Design a protein with these regions (language model features):
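Zinc-dependent deaminase catalytic domain
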Residues: 1-136
């Protein structure tokens, strides 16, 4: 989890710094991601400070991790995901399930305000797809 926190610090988002790390069966880091803009997109302070604009450009840490693994030809099947800041949203949960991540660890000290509906759907999908999750 500490490595995921460090990766989150790479985000240029002044208000939210989320990090994600996928770990293989031998403890090796397979991929990492943080909330930020896509490759080649200017991540200017103005875009981050205008929330409606930011939300159009931002890639969640979990999505970024999946894209980075794909870009580098790394399979995440059977891996473990560590994510900081917030629980996995329902959009990211679909990607987590689809690439074969089997375990998800999230921080227990987060503010669920505004995220409860999305998290409830994520939890439901994780249970149905037999993805283990835990707040640590």
């Amino acid at each position: 989890m500490e490595i995921a926190k460090a990766v989150g610090e790479w985000s240029k988002d002044p208000s939210t710094k989320i990090g994600a790390v996928a770990v293989g069966s031998k403890g090796q880091i397979l991929a990492q991601g943080y909330n930020g803009f896509a490759r080649g997109i200017l991540d200017t302070e103005e875009r981050y400070n205008d929330r409606p604009t930011k939300y159009k450009y931002i890639v969640h840490a979990e999505q970024n991790l999946i894209y980075n693994a794909t870009y580098n030809g790394v399979s995440l099947d059977g891996s473990t995901l560590y994510v900081t800041g917030l629980p996995v949203c329902s959009e990211c949960a679909k990607g987590v399930i689809q690439v074969g991540i089997r375990r998800v660890y999230m921080p227990k000290d987060f503010d669920i305000k505004g995220w409860s509906e999305s998290w409830e759907l994520s939890a439901s999908m994780f249970k149905e797809a037999d993805v283990y999750y835990e707040f640590i």
